[in-house]
């Protein structure tokens, strides 16, 4: 065994998976996981833990995997993470734990994410669940939103003895995990639903179809329903658009709507009653993980798909693995290209998109080189569908109906990043509702910090 090289992970063949919604990555078996775990040198000053937003004790759980003690490995992980099977699949490990791995300075870093996934999947298959709190403390906390921030906050509070109720606006719990991430990357019934069941097994209650700010307000939850504190983890579901001519044409979608139709409403299923446009030639504007998800979904629905991104490949914000998979599956990358107008016929249906070539100039405030238009380089792409994947912002419904809850100019809730405390007493917030669209694991980290903040607040009362 070459300790500098990772144990390869089995995947569906690219041609085969491009025509189905089954999970792409097949994961490790026990023997492969133990062999990969044996590459870990068990650093005393583990940088990988510092790179993890929820501070999983990575060397300890990997040591248990190496020794074949998978249940103990799961116990270690579940002390820090409420959603290990999710994180093992969708976290950007290359810029977090694996990016800090000492092995990676000379050779391949340890496949921490794949090992976490293996442990979580093994625990699920063997009926192992996290340990609930020994007793309740009599205090009630409301959690708004059942995405990664809300589930993490709720799970941690339940372990501390709080009576926690999650209020979810949609008809199904999971937030972005169910409506935003495709089945081929994150299976819903086999993975997400089981993770939610684990959170519920801690004593967490989930009420769906409750739109906080409309069905009930935060003030009513605290003053009339008897909740001692509230955590807002409602995410950022309001899509952004470019503001170019033609964006109101038929068959221009936000990635948020397009993926929700497919993921939550199962529009990819021929028996589903939820319609979705089966475009023949689709452009997805954007370069993040959501853009890759939308593009790979459209591909599976039979389209020729183009990613249109105004910067170069080096600046793509999507995970390296997602870009690699998209390329393998046949998605075309039109880089250094920016849309300037969406074209349509006399009935308002998309016929194409006028674009202009870009080149990279000086770095902007983000540190990435600023894209600059190349004069006279305009051209037209013939298309029948355009999907805009330009990020999302929080829906202002909650903040606009809650007195004393301040937001910034982007309508994000202002909260202390260390404990989630907002400008309204007893109300905490975290995840995309505070930061704008970000990653699952960062939302989980915020939920974890807020749970600690809420516990400190209520313990002092």
Give residue ranges: language-model regions:
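Glycine-rich dinucleotide-binding loop and its adjacent helix/turn
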Residues: 119-135, 192-214, 239-301, 407-418, ...
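Ferredoxin-type iron-sulfur electron-transfer modules in oxidoreductases and energy-metabolism complexes
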Residues: 17-35, 56-89, 106-133, 262-263
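FAD-site-proximal beta/loop scaffold in flavoenzymes
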Residues: 248-279, 363-437
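A conserved FAD-binding loop/helix module that cradles the flavin
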Residues: 433-460
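Rossmann-like dinucleotide-binding cores of NAD(P)H-dependent redox enzymes
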Residues: 163-166, 170-201, 205-207, 295-341
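N-terminal Rossmann-like FAD-binding beta1-loop-alpha1 element of flavoenzymes
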Residues: 140-165, 291-299
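Local cysteine-cluster metal-coordination motifs and their immediate loop/turn environment
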Residues: 38-57, 82-105
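Feature captures the FAD/FMN-dependent oxidoreductase FAD-binding
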Residues: 72, 135-136, 140-144, 196-244, ...
């Amino acid at each position: 065994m070459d300790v500098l090289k990772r144990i390869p992970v089995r995947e569906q063949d690219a041609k085969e998976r491009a025509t189905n919604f089954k999970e792409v990555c097949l994961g490790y078996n026990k023997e492969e996981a133990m062999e990969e775990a044996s590459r870990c040198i068990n650093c005393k000053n583990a940088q990988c833990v510092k790179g993890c937003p929820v501070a999983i004790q990575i060397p300890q759980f990997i040591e248990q995997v190496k020794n074949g003690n998978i249940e103990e490995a799961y116990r270690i992980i579940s002390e820090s993470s409420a959603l290990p099977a999710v994180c093992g699949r969708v976290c950007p490990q290359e810029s977090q734990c694996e990016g800090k791995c000492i092995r990676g300075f000379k050779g391949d870093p340890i496949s921490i994410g794949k090992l976490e996934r293996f442990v979580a999947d093994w625990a699920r298959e063997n009926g192992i669940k996290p340990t609930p709190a020994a007793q309740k403390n009599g205090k009630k906390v409301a959690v708004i939103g059942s995405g990664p921030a809300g589930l993490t906050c709720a799970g941690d509070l339940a372990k501390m003895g709080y009576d926690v109720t999650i209020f979810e606006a949609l008809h199904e719990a999971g937030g972005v995990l169910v409506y935003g991430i495709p089945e081929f990357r994150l299976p819903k019934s086999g993975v997400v639903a089981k993770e939610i069941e684990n959170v519920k097994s801690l004593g967490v209650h989930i009420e769906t179809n409750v739109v906080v700010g409309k069905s009930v307000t935060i003030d009513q939850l605290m003053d009339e329903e008897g909740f001692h504190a509230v955590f807002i983890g409602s995410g950022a579901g309001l899509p952004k658009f470019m503001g170019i001519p033609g964006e109101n044409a038929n068959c221009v979608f936000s990635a948020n709507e397009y993926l929700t139709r497919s993921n939550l409403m199962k529009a990819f299923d021929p028996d589903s009653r939820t319609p979705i446009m089966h475009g023949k030639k689709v452009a997805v504007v954007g370069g993040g993980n959501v853009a890759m998800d939308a593009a790979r979904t459209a591909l599976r629905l039979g389209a020729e798909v183009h990613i249109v991104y105004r910067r170069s490949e080096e600046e793509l914000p999507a995970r390296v693995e997602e870009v690699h998979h998209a390329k393998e599956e046949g998605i075309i990358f039109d880089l250094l290209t920016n849309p300037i107008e969406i074209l349509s016929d006399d009935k308002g249906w998309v016929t194409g998109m006028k674009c202009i070539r870009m080149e990279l100039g000086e770095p902007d405030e983000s540190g990435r080189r600023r894209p600059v238009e190349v004069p006279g380089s305009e051209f037209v792409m013939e298309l029948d569908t355009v999907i805009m994947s330009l990020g999302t912002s929080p829906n202002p419904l909650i903040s606009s109906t809650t007195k004393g809850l301040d937001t910034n100019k982007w309508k994000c809730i202002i909260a202390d990043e260390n404990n989630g405390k907002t400008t309204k007493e007893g109300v905490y917030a975290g995840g995309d509702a505070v930061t704008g669209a970000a990653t699952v694991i960062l939302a989980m980290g915020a939920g974890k910090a807020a749970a600690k903040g809420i516990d400190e607040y209520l313990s002092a009362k």
